[in-house]
Amino acid sequence: MRLLLGLLGVCGLLMVPCPVGVAQADAGDCPPYCDRIPSSAWIAAPSIPLYDVYRWPDPAAVAMPTSAPRWQFEEQCAVPAGREDPRDYAVAGRAVVTQPAGEWQLQIQVLHWRGETWRTGETAMTVLRGATDAIRRCQHTAPGSSPTITTDLGTGVAAVLSVAGERVLREYLLADPRNGTVVELAMWASSPPRVPWSARSDVEVLAALAVPLCTAYIDSCL
């Protein structure tokens, strides 16, 4: 519990004030530039699981704008498309690192909704709750899949989804209602992967996704 409070307190998701000056603001932060994902919004490469093995590139350097983004687990779980999906009108960016077969693949997405935070924050939380529910239902929508939610903090969720003998997926999703943003970090490999899974705790990974948002979306975490 102390670890949870300490890590998520840094980014204020447990209503603990975030210290001013955690990182220096960049000229491209939001505001004023809110029609794209700021470079400062992305998780630092060394904080991505298995960095010591793969030496991941800076996500901001490989990210591209994307439209109507969907989570990595949705195809595996055969999640049916909804009639109205808030992700269709989000400002979004995606960073993908493709590896040879048997290695861990990487996808990171940042979705942001512009507007008054009381409204966009609720949108972000609605999207996260929908994703969490879809993961829980995965074994029903895709009977060959086996989902396990390893951490559910309300504002962040981590899960392992596997298809026996075929694929394993590690999914992290983090919502920050103070700036109307949701971040996904997904890593997957054919089973068994060449490199055994190794990562910091779920809470630490989720915190690493959350902290940059306080810099990218100016004054959102005060």
Regions found by a protein language model. Name each.
Residues Q24, G28, R70-W71, T132, ...:
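Processing junctions and N-termini across compartments
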Residues Y89-E122:
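A short acidic-to-branched-hydrophobic micro-motif
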Residues T120-V127, A131, D202-V205:
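Stable alpha-helical elements in mature extracytoplasmic
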Residues A142-L222:
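A short, solvent-exposed beta-edge/loop patch
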